[in-house]
Amino acid sequence: MAKKIIGYIKLQIPAGKANPSPPVGPALGQRGLNIMEFCKAFNAATQGMEPGLPIPVVITAFADKSFTFVMKTPPASILLKKAAGLQKGSSNPLTNKVGKLTRAQLEEIAKTKDPDLTAADLDAAVRTIAGSARSMGLDVEGVV
């Protein structure tokens, strides 16, 4: 028989830097989960990733105080800013362009994001990422 699920917790935690302080501690503490056990497991799972890269994670809490977690891919906006070498996007994306990305860079980001995108193929995924880039004030080359 499957364990009874008491809730889901969605967080964005920097890779390799999970610790009991907010937001992790209070979110897990409310459900009575072992905070340090999660922190150790998350940090071990993100060990090979770039330190500090925000990783979305969905934690499933069970009635017996156990948990499982699923890591998603980093947000597209973070990957786009990193590829363009920016600190933040444009405050007015229609008139104030802050950077430029090529199709090759967008394809690389689309391949990274592929498990979380619902796109039918790589070209559709690239167009999705290109739309995110445009909304951040980035010029996109080679994508219609």
From Swiss-Prot:
Keyword annotations from UniProtKB, A to Z: Methylation, Ribonucleoprotein, Ribosomal protein, RNA-binding, rRNA-binding
GO molecular function, one term: large ribosomal subunit rRNA binding
Stretches that traverse the bilayer: none
Coiled-coil positions: none
Pfam families, sorted: Ribosomal_L11 (PF00298), Ribosomal_L11_N (PF03946)
InterPro entries cross-referenced by the UniProt entry: Ribosomal_uL11, Ribosomal_uL11_bac-typ, Ribosomal_uL11_C, Ribosomal_uL11_C_sf, Ribosomal_uL11_CS, Ribosomal_uL11_N, Ribosomal_uL11_N_sf
Assembly description: Part of the ribosomal stalk of the 50S ribosomal subunit. Interacts with L10 and the large rRNA to form the base of the stalk. L10 forms an elongated spine to which L12 dimers bind in a sequential fashion forming a multimeric L10(L12)X complex.
Protein name, per record: Large ribosomal subunit protein uL11
Organism: Neisseria meningitidis serogroup B (strain ATCC BAA-335 / MC58)
